[in-house]
């Protein structure tokens, strides 16, 4: 995330996403903490032996004094969301869309519908708009937004992006590429 708004609690100043991450990277470097990127943990034994692997070292073990599980998050797939229809190109998770725009410099679409009004969905609506996309709607299954009020104002209201609460995607049209979606209102009873 390249927008600002990070660091207020931790560093007592407003930072962009890269600046915020940079502060933590500097702390790790200053403290001499060993770290391994692109590494997968295969096993953690009861006596704290961590078996891991990566391309550089292959399979290896680390004897740990303590183990802290900080595994990040994994986005739910479209299948886990029970959205019917084909799986055409042009449908992305929020994390993939963020990576494409922020790191790869690639716009995933010109006309966008965002499902989910948590802070990531709201911020991506603004980001896609700033990059030239037309965000047609942000749809939210719940009768309220999961995002901060300030993000609703700064990311949707300031850009005239509509928010449809109690709505979800019930169909995806298109076989090769997404051609459209169908939204439906939900009533809380399923």
Placement of each model-derived feature along the sequence:
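FAD-binding core/adjacent interface of flavoenzyme oxidoreductases
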Residues: 20-111, 186-190
